């Protein structure tokens, strides 16, 4: 049996090369492209690697023309080698920024499929552009019968304009910006590009964190947006570019603080409309949508021109500071007072609200979830609040707090999706706690099923504390730790720093996933409250 988690970087690069070609590709071309990417191997070695990929059914030989990637190969490309893919979003941003050429009409687009009536799609798209909430005034709309294909300009095109004028913008993060009275006020949530294996704007849109239609209809809502910065010495040149800018996608810029994000010394921060903004209303209105950010480079003239009313740029500083999930976790640890010997104390819980009519069904589902060991411990809480039921599950940060009280410091690194099947156990997507304001498990909640994919966290512990960690864990006798790795060795595809051991924790939200899988509407908040452990009930007692 082939363990898919063992794919090395050369194999992944070959899959990536094949995925970007519409025609079969031969060993000679693959070897040439690999050399460009820093892998100095010849045609013979490439043919050997291709045979390995053929054996895994990730590629297929097409006569003498070469190889094509299979559907299984495309799926594997999206999952394999998570440590390598962690920087893929940032790498793709740089590649597309450099490869585009707005001056000569070559632009980066996002490609999306909306399963809806063409006229309905056109009406919504026009309303977004007329309100000024799009990058540029060009869009591609094609009726494919079963779906409508939409191609929108990516905000990277503005970065390309800056680059052509000698300004190199450093891409920091993407998020959602709160609007009041039709103007941007502050970033509500963010994810750093370098801290994620998934596209941040796609994640926020699919999680329904946006409200673009609210901005259009009454001036209040949440906009998908990107954030960059560059050296303050370029400010005058930047403002000259704005005077002739055709894309009209800047919503705010300034020094020190821009919409709640610290810029730092001698820098100018810039917030831009996300290129996926015209797509967000379809997700907000529950249309079936497939999103492919930064998909390709096309001729600008191939896109249709729409009426667009540009909005004013805001330069007012915000009075707030965005807190990362890691900062929230460290503060939450301090609130944990659980004593192992007394089997009681304060713990951190996630909360979820459901309609009271689902109470009996939810009880049965949660009991089954805890029987399967999906909870951090065997306890959860049920609280009636008017016509709603509040469900409380112990959060994994409680484990961090308990271990810290026993002089074992765990360092939270990532939250993500852990895939567990017969032939592989690996993380397939992650977000760094220090690079996101949202708990990663809130982002990934709708992408797991608790059958093959689970919410899980990744921590590090120094090798000298590993033995004590195991002692405390044995004494605690909870389910929360999935695995502890060897010093200096990767665990489930994630590497560690020198002399550190990986620690994989199961997500405290996993029991709630089963409610979602059984189509019970749920309102979720991770790491939300402090409760007494004794106030929670064991599933065995209910």
From Swiss-Prot:
Region (Winged helix-turn-helix): 12-77
Pfam families noted in UniProt: HTH_12, NRD1_2
Region NRD 2, residue ranges: 321-542
Keyword vocabulary terms for this entry: DNA-binding, Repeat, Repressor, Transcription, Transcription regulation
Ways its activity is controlled: Under nitrogen limitation, binding of the intracellular nitrogen metabolite 2-oxoglutarate to NrpR decreases the binding affinity of NrpR to DNA, leading to initiation of transcription.
Highest taxon in the source lineage: Archaea
Subunit structure: Homodimer.
More details: Adopts different quaternary structures in its active apo state compared with its inhibited 2-oxoglutarate-bound state. In the 2-oxoglutarate-bound state, NrpR is inhibited from binding to DNA because its DNA-binding domains are too far apart to recognize the operator DNA sequence.
Annotated family: Belongs to the NrpR family.
UniProt GO molecular function: DNA binding
Protein name listed in UniProt: Global nitrogen regulator NrpR
Protein's organism: Methanocaldococcus jannaschii (strain ATCC 43067 / DSM 2661 / JAL-1 / JCM 10045 / NBRC 100440) (Methanococcus jannaschii)
InterPro entries for this protein: NRD, NrpR, NrpR_dom_sf, RNase_R_HTH_12, WH_DNA-bd_sf
Region described as NRD 1: 85-320
Role summary: Transcriptional repressor of nitrogen fixation and assimilation genes. Binds to two tandem operators in the glnA and nif promoters, thereby blocking transcription of the genes.
């Amino acid at each position: 049996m082939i363990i898919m988690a063992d794919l090395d970087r050369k194999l992944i690069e070959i899959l990536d090369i094949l995925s970007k070609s519409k025609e079969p590709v031969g060993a000679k071309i693959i070897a040439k492209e690999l050399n460009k990417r820093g892998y100095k191997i010849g045609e013979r070695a490439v043919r050997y690697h291709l045979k390995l990929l053929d054996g895994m059914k990730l590629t297929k030989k097409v006569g003498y023309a070469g190889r094509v990637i299979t559907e299984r190969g495309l799926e594997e490309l999206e999952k394999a080698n998570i440590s390598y893919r962690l920087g893929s979003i940032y790498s793709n941003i740089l590649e597309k920024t450099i490869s585009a050429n707005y001056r000569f009409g070559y632009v980066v687009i996002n490609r999306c499929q909306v399963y809806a009536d063409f006229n309905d799609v056109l009406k919504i798209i026009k309303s977004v552009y007329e309100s000024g909430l799009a990058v540029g005034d060009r869009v591609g709309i094609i009726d494919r019968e079963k779906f409508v294909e939409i191609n929108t300009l990516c905000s990277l095109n503005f970065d390309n304009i800056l680059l052509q004028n000698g300004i190199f913008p450093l891409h920091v993060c993407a998020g959602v910006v709160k609007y009041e009275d039709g103007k941007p006020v502050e970033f509500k949530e963010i994810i750093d590009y370098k801290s994620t294996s998934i596209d941040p704007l796609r994640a926020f849109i699919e999680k329904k964190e946006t409200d673009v239609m609210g901005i259009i209809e009454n001036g209040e809502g949440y906009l998908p947006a990107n954030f960059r910065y560059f050296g303050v010495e370029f400010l005058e040149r930047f403002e000259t570019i704005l005077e002739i800018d055709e894309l009209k996608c800047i919503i705010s810029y300034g020094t020190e603080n821009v919409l709640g994000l610290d810029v730092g010394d001698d820098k100018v921060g810039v917030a831009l409309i996300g290129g996926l903004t015209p797509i967000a209303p379809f997700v907000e209105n529950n249309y079936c949508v497939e999103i492919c950010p930064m998909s390709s480079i096309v001729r600008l003239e191939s896109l249709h021109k729409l009426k667009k009313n540009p909005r004013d740029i805001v330069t007012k500083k915000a009075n707030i500071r965005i807190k990362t999930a890691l900062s929230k976790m460290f503060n939450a640890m301090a609130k944990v007072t659980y004593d192992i010997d007394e089997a009681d104390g304060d713990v951190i819980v996630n909360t979820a609200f459901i309609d009271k009519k689902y109470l009996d069904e939810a009880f049965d589902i949660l009991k089954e979830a805890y029987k399967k060991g999906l909870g951090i411990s065997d306890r959860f809480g049920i609280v009636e609040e008017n016509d709603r039921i509040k469900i409380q599950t112990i959060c994994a940060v409680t484990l961090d707090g308990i271990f810290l009280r026993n002089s074992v410091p765990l360092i939270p690194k990532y939250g993500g999706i852990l895939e567990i099947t017969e032939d592989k156990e690996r993380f397939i997507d992650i977000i760094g706690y220090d690079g996101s304001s949202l708990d990663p498990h809130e982002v990934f909640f709708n992408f797991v099923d608790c059958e093959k994919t689970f919410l899980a966290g990744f921590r590090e512990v120094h090798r000298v504390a590993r033995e004590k960690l195991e002692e405390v864990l044995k004494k605690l006798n909870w389910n929360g730790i999935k695995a502890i790795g060897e010093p200096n060795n990767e665990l489930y595809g994630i590497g560690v720093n020198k002399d550190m051991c990986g620690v994989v924790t199961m997500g405290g939200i996993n029991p709630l996933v089963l409610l979602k899988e059984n189509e019970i509407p749920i309102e979720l908040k991770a790491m939300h409250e402090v409760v007494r452990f004794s106030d929670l009930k064991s599933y065995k007692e209910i």
